[in-house]
């Protein structure tokens, strides 16, 4: 269906809030399957029967870690060998059920799981409902239907649990595109992707919090250092602020990814240290601005992997080829945390100090107003000239050499 458009995440959340079933698909390079999803509070016999009739897959009950602990739902196996590490617990039935398999009795079990008064002794195992424990952090940590189900229930203001069921085609194989799209249209069912849900959360969830503010005298001048911590990962970042950023005027700003070798060791294999110095100097001269120092070593692959990439570069690969050879994308960085840091600092619009078009696009996607790009001008040396040319040719970096 070439003219098909996925639903808005807001519409999917509202449908979940109203007790409806929606369709959610994951990535093509993962399961590439669609699941029916609804909230556990609306695990009615009708919804379960619909999933069993049209989905024909295993009806599971994704739950938060808190619910699993409260009800003492233990992992199904000691060693999880599932291809995607789906976190099955022991299967359960509520003690008020008979066989537990009918749509009506599975409804009882699912709804009792989210009952405020539920306790571990209310359930027996094995049973006919299959709880799955969602990762803390949801789809931003694991892009599975388990996490999507719990995230959607939470975003809808409901208990952090739901139902999900894989969808099989009439021939018994898993239904994929475009048949999933056709089904959604025929049943007037909201249909979103997990990627959409990830993007929605990055834009709307509060994913970073400010911890402290302290004076930071530097060789460039005096700045204020604002410390931040990511809510999900605990990763720490710093904003170096000069002057008042909250007056509504556009702010000279830079996102600088941590580079221990360039920033601290003075390595000439990259231009990171020079870019940091140039940005600090320019902001000091202007008397107002901010540098976000993000812990994204090696374009997001980490220090050790960056050094491993250097080894491959010494054997003839370029910086992009080396990252890919190690199993990474050419650039693993994302900028939604940086965008939220800008927002918490009161920054409304920026003149972005960068040569990297991906930073511009990444911040714009988060709704940040970038009024201009200010180039970072550094002189290449014999050790980094080839590296910079590769970034220019393969990654679109905007250099003037």
Swiss-Prot record:
Annotated site, Essential for DHBP synthase activity, chain positions: 128, 166
Catalytic activity annotation: D-ribulose 5-phosphate = (2S)-2-hydroxy-3-oxobutyl phosphate + formate + H(+); GTP + 4 H2O = 2,5-diamino-6-hydroxy-4-(5-phosphoribosylamino)-pyrimidine + formate + 2 phosphate + 3 H(+)
Active-site residues, Swiss-Prot/TrEMBL: 331 (proton acceptor), 333 (nucleophile)
Superkingdom assignment: Bacteria
Pfam families linked: DHBP_synthase, GTP_cyclohydro2
UniProt-annotated binding residues for Mg(2+) 2: 31, 145
Cofactor requirements of the protein: Mg(2+); Mn(2+); Zn(2+)
List of residues binding Mg(2+) 1: 31
GO biological process: riboflavin biosynthetic process
Residues that coordinate or bind Zn(2+): 259, 270, 272
Residues where GTP binds: 254-258, 275, 297-299, 319, 354, 359
Ranges for region DHBP synthase: 1-203
Cofactor binding summary note: Binds 2 divalent metal cations per subunit. Magnesium or manganese. Binds 1 zinc ion per subunit.
Family indicated by similarity: In the N-terminal section; belongs to the DHBP synthase family. In the C-terminal section; belongs to the GTP cyclohydrolase II family.
Protein's name according to its UniProt entry: Riboflavin biosynthesis protein RibBA
Species of provenance: Actinobacillus pleuropneumoniae serotype 3 (strain JL03)
Organismal lineage: Bacteria, Pseudomonadati, Pseudomonadota, Gammaproteobacteria, Pasteurellales
């Amino acid at each position: 269906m070439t003219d098909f458009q996925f639903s808005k995440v807001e519409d999917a959340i509202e449908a979940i809030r109203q007790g409806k079933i929606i369709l959610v698909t994951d990535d093509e390079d993962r399961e590439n399957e669609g699941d029916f999803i609804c909230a556990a509070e609306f695990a009615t016999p009708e919804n379960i029967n619909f999933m069993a009739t049209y989905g024909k897959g295993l009806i599971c009950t994704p739950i938060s870690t808190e619910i699993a602990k409260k009800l003492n739902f233990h992992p199904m196996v000691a060693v999880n060998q599932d291809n995607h590490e789906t976190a099955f617990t022991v299967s359960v039935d509520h003690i008020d059920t008979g066989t537990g398999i009918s749509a009506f009795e599975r409804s009882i079990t699912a709804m009792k799981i989210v009952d405020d008064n539920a306790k571990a002794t209310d359930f027996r195992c094995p049973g006919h409902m299959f709880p799955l424990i969602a990762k803390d952090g949801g789809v931003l940590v694991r892009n599975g239907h388990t996490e999507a189900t719990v995230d959607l229930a939470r975003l809808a203001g409901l208990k952090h649990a739901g139902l999900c069921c894989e969808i099989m085609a009439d021939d018994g194989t898993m239904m994929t595109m475009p048949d999933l799209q056709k089904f959604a249209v025929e049943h007037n069912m909201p249909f979103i992707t997990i990627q959409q849900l990830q993007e929605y959360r990055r834009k709307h969830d509060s994913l970073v919090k400010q911890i402290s503010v302290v004076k930071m005298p530097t060789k460039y001048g005096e700045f204020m250092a604002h410390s931040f911590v990511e809510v999900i990962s605990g990763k720490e970042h710093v904003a170096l602020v000069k002057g008042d950023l909250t007056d509504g005027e556009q702010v000279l700003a830079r996102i600088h990814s941590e580079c221990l070798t360039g920033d601290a060791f003075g390595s000439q294999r990259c231009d990171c240290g020079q870019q940091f110095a140039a940005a600090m100097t320019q902001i000091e001269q202007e008397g107002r601005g901010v540098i976000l120092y993000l812990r994204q070593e090696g374009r997001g692959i980490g220090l050790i992997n960056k050094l491993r990439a250097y080894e491959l570069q010494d054997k003839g690969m370029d910086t992009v080829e080396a990252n890919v050879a190690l199993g990474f994308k050419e650039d693993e960085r994302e900028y939604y945390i940086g965008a939220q840091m800008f927002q918490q600092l009161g920054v409304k619009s920026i003149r972005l100090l960068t040569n990297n078009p991906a930073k511009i696009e990444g911040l714009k996607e988060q709704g940040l107003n970038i009024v201009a790009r200010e180039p970072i001008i550094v002189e290449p040396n014999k050790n980094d000239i080839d590296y910079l040319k590769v970034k220019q040719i393969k990654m679109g970096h905007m250099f003037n050499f």
